[in-house]
């Protein structure tokens, strides 16, 4: 393995020509080996002997080396002698001076087949037996032990060697290996500085750096640092989620043990059970002495455990409140001294377990595993934060030096006044506040003295330090710890080190400039992390200047402490600390309108204030969830949705958070409604529709079953229609755990007991192996409530939860019968429904026999399988039964076991009394009937699908289905909303006119429940007192029932950041090649278009704003046909009266294909050439990628449309005057339109071909007099259309339908129509037809 020498002086001290040559070489050297998408970097730790003591799990992905072949091995064994020598030189340098980061470039051989799979090759795959030698960059820092500051190890992060896009100036070449492509963006900014100065000949006109919006931390980041920051941000957010999940687990432990103590105080005869063994044996039964009784007392043991848990819970990662000078970067601290002391105390804490039973030992080992998981996560998080801060500070420092050099060169010919200003000293030092916001006064770390009593060069605080406090994320969410997706880079020095060396930094006084505008700057503090830190911060004010989640925006104003321009050189601020709220809140969203109401919560359409993205927010009231015993349901649904983040079959979950009284699940907004609403509108579905929808549902359920998830609530209302027309499953509240065992609460009037079903069944299962790992809820079977335990049989059970953290499992044993993977789950024989166990607990009763309201089924019973009703454990076959009920309802319009009461429905299900319709079945439907019959088999073992999903796929009903491409085929229905805020396809189910202020007035959990200040771990009392119990309750940051309930879908946020990076690259390349971007071309065309309209009459602007949602980004390869409607209006000035909310066409969703399904209208003076689709205006500053769907052919089509008629303009629903006659006709019936306009001079015609557009038009509050149809509309039969309109409650429910055809005999006799218009179309035929309909005097 050949090691490339790293003498940074060879890079930095070459002449300009050599610099450009080297940059060009780097840009072309590995052209065929550059990753097409960013690969996750690898983080590892080296001891001072060069041995790996930690490496992230993605080592095999990037380096093609398994993790188990690295840990404990020497660098020489993995990277060869050259690699070992290089890293050891860097390690020795760090031990001597750790104020610098060190860079090592090495080469490593990768199997070609592995490289092909991981996108290393851009131009064809290489032979699988060939080796590829690829350069890598590693940058490391020294990590010290907390508290003692003794060197512990070195931390390194490895990335593929990067390069800029094209050559860069010598000034930024030294940053090339660090920020890669960002060096090109920095070089461009320096060019902008020079251009602006030469243009205005003034320092006051120098431009500010243009920031980019990080979707993870929601902050504005400099473009050249954005790619590196996004990796830092993702890595720290990953660790935060790990630590938060571990914190939740410890809180569950603590709450459980506390209630056990309370229960034992009220009834001392209770004996605990852990893993089916007595936790503390009865001393009398085992002839223990009095001394041993005291040693083995439960209270004493629990007190020790509570003390241990409390110390672990009190460990926090406080916010980085310290503003440090770069020369004092080693003073940066990211953890409070008390937390550091607590960590050391836990390491040395070993309680005496002598003479303890195996259950006691097992309990202690499980708790210790959870504690160790948190400690490990905290240490990793602390190191990641420290690492990212160190690298950011170095980059900021060197970038500022570069900017100062450029400005200094610009003003060399200026007056002596300017020169004198350039030579001014440091910016004013910052005055610190008297106390920190979140840390206790005694925890505030001693800072360097002010500039008044220390030398400026090393004690004063530079103004740049305002931005150098933290780059880590404010949110908690779930991503893998072991795949920290962050790249490292740092400038090096002109040191004589052979392989690695730091870059000497000039003193800050050499290049910093004072600015009186910064004299009164307030102290900045970034946000706390992780979420359980006891600190409060103000929420971010609403801002409309930021970009949409997947479209990069340009914020011109970053606030009072944002990017401001001290004179003469611009000051960079990589992070704007106050730009993100500390705690997610519903105030971050604008609730627009209700979508639907369910049994336990409501769903609303909302828009995120910072980005403009649209989401569906499910809001649940905590008190209702607890009262209705839905705690486990909520936690299970959240966990499942988190685990299905990449599934194309499940509605995506993006965020979860809570307030004092409510839970919020921010989900993907699927604007097509649900199949329940579709059925309500259509009545029944065609067989082709049924086949497609059921096939997609089969794929979805098969995928869930393969993952060990049983949905158990399959019904039309839970099948959502996405933007592209395909189905997605939602509402997993009843999944895994079953139905009836979730709807019972303990009814006890004596001893208060702990219901583990509400507390401990859904504790997170953390997988730390990949960045996409998620929290998996562990199931819990809860049998019927036991009777009051007898005196000798009272057992207090902790069993009921399985927790897996950091790959190490400890179990509160859970039953395997309802586990997602029963074969891998330990089985417990104890009753898990209660902490009390009795040997005479009753058997489970069927639902319909239960008279206790607390044990009756809550929800829709029509789709429940008979085995579930009988109380048997749920199996996968129960989902297939529900699917059979859905097929029946799709075909006939009602459930197969429908009855007036739930009890009757249950009786029908158990007796298999299917309510078949009386009509005669066709041969075509007989196959569907056979599918229903086999799915509704009473014996689960014989039910279709019991042996796997392939059984269902092989059924003749799906003979024409291509299972491999069904999700890529055109669906039967594609939603065409009028606007992004249109919810026309949803059935609100009574949720109307709700006052949203009830949600906005809710305080956050932290605001509602202030935590006590952090106490030294050593001060924790050894025994639990009454006051301590109360404090334990109040110190919980969130209700124990729901945990922290904080989650962010980092996978999608990271994709958004990567999308921004790709846009930056494309835009930079477009500028370099001097090509006109798509949006510039389109803007020019639109300007000509509007100019032509204005020659006739002035036209008011039609506003347009792009709000791309996550669903739009996910389905970016799919174009959606929009319902673009143009209606007749009297004057083009009516443009001014159009409302933006009724905009029917917005650019990011314009279709590329022909105007199928697009409706048009004609006024009295219009002809065929005048019919066209007018377009709204385009706001300036739109990114070119927003219009990637608008191809050249599309623009040509738009230009070809006629612009010659003065009265031709866009019209919108609601502008019709109801005193006029209105008709709908096919848009190709121009002859019919002209004749009708002659007959009815005041007639308004709406030209629509698409049946769905016709249906949507008729279902609005806009009256039509006649609907002309071509017989045999595609996909939706005429009878279906008529049925939907006739059964609706709109003003068009009795509108006449007239079919246009060549011969009246082609109309089936059983088709009920109001009239037939025969061709050729003449005035006489139309008059005859309409007279029969009595339309003349309408």
From Swiss-Prot:
Q: Which residues form the active site?
A: 713
What biological processes does GO assign it? intracellular signal transduction; positive regulation of mitotic metaphase/anaphase transition
- Biased-composition ranges, Low complexity, are 1159-1174
The UniProt record lists the PAS domain at: 28-98
Q: Name one GO molecular function term.
A: ATP binding
Polar residues biased stretches: 491-501, 541-550, 813-842
Q: What is its EC number?
A: 2.7.11.1
Which positions carry Phosphoserine?
A: 525, 748, 1211
Q: Which reaction does it catalyse?
A: L-seryl-[protein] + ATP = O-phospho-L-seryl-[protein] + ADP + H(+); L-threonyl-[protein] + ATP = O-phospho-L-threonyl-[protein] + ADP + H(+)
Record-listed ATP binding positions: 595-603, 618
Key words, A-Z? ATP-binding, Kinase, Nucleotide-binding, Phosphoprotein, Serine/threonine-protein kinase, Transferase
Pfam families (alphabetical): Pkinase (PF00069)
Taking every annotated instance into account, which residue ranges of this chain make up the domain AGC-kinase C-terminal?
959-1057
Protein kinase domain location, by residue? 589-958
Q: Region entry Disordered: which residue ranges?
A: 484-554, 813-844, 1010-1035, 1159-1185
What GO cellular component entries does it have?
A: cytoplasm; cytosol; nucleus
- Source domain of life: Eukaryota
State the family it belongs to: Belongs to the protein kinase superfamily. Ser/Thr protein kinase family.
**Described function:** May facilitate the progression of anaphase through direct or indirect interaction with the cut8 protein.
Q: What is this protein called?
A: Serine/threonine-protein kinase cek1
Organism of this sequence: Schizosaccharomyces pombe (strain 972 / ATCC 24843) (Fission yeast)
